[in-house]
């Protein structure tokens, strides 16, 4: 099985990455496409970014600075050394609820390698990342209407690239089921009809006032927890995910079907 997650807007640029995975770093597969997008972003002033991304003045200043500092070339790729184009592996740079659940900082080498082989992180700038791909800080959500050589938005820019990359990775790892843990905004970049896989979308519901519903904060963390569960237990097929029980969640067969798997958590376990 192969998992998909969305990235995070918040970034962890300070915590040190465990040394045991440093030999497994890689460069983003679609980096040349990232260069084309960054060329456009570098031409934007902070006020332009503020309007384009609907962000505050402080965030627009920060991301304009990030854009100008972003640098990659064949001769000087990303590195974990301050003497080069300093970068950090994606699974450790992204912060927020999903990545709190995933918690790669606490993983041993074997679990980190498992995640790297079975997880793709969708990205507005990088297309689709492996967790151990080195990347530099950025902000570019997939839904951003950034005009480019292919059209008026990032969905037109990425076209079939994201889907083709996912298909190739699934073939390489003999995966036949895609576990969609990404948001609608990001999963829209995947051409479902061209995807050579069965798609399963887990749904996480929490009890509140006697009713079960999707609560964003909890659901995001549960998405990361599900990938962590698969890595910690070295799962080999999707059916094993129905045993997912971290943080009090349990699979509800009578509410699930082939495409949507429902997991619930009672109020007492929250």
UniProtKB/Swiss-Prot annotation:
Q: What biological-process GO terms show up in the record?
A: response to hydroperoxide
Extract one GO cellular component term from the record.
cytosol
Q: Which residues form the signal peptide?
A: none
Pfam family of the protein (one):
H2O2_YaaD
Q: Which InterPro entries match?
A: YaaA (IPR005583)
Q: Which family does this protein fall into?
A: Belongs to the UPF0246 family.
Protein name (Swiss-Prot/TrEMBL): UPF0246 protein Psyc_0554
């Amino acid at each position: 099985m192969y998992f998909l997650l969305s990235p995070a807007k918040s970034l962890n640029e300070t915590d040190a990455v465990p040394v045991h995975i440093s030999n497994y770093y890689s460069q983003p597969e679609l980096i040349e496409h990232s260069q084309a997008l960054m060329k456009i972003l570098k031409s934007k002033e902070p006020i332009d970014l503020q309007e384009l991304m609907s962000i505050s003045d402080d965030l627009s200043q920060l991301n304009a600075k990030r854009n100008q500092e972003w640098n990659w070339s064949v001769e000087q790729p990303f590195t974990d050394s301050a003497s080069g184009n300093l970068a950090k592996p994606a699974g450790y740079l992204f912060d927020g609820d999903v990545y709190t659940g995933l918690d790669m900082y606490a993983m041993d080498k074997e679990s980190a390698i498992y995640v790297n082989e079975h997880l793709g992180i969708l990205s507005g700038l990088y297309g689709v990342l492996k967790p151990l791909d080195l990347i530099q800080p950025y902000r570019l959500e997939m839904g951003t209407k950034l005009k480019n050589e292919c059209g008026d938005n990032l969905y037109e820019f990425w076209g079939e690239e994201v889907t083709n990359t996912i298909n190739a990775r699934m073939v390489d790892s003999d995966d036949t089921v895609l576990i969609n843990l990404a948001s609608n905004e990001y999963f829209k970049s995947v051409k479902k009809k061209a995807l050579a896989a069965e798609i399963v979308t887990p749904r996480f519901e929490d009890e509140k006032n006697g009713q079960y519903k999707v609560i964003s904060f909890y659901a995001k963390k549960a998405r990361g927890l599900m990938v962590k569960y698969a890595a910690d237990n070295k799962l080999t097929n999707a059916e094993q995910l129905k045993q997912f029980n971290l943080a009090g969640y349990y699979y509800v067969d009578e509410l699930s079907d082939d495409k949507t798997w429902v997991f619930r958590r009672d109020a007492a376990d929250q």
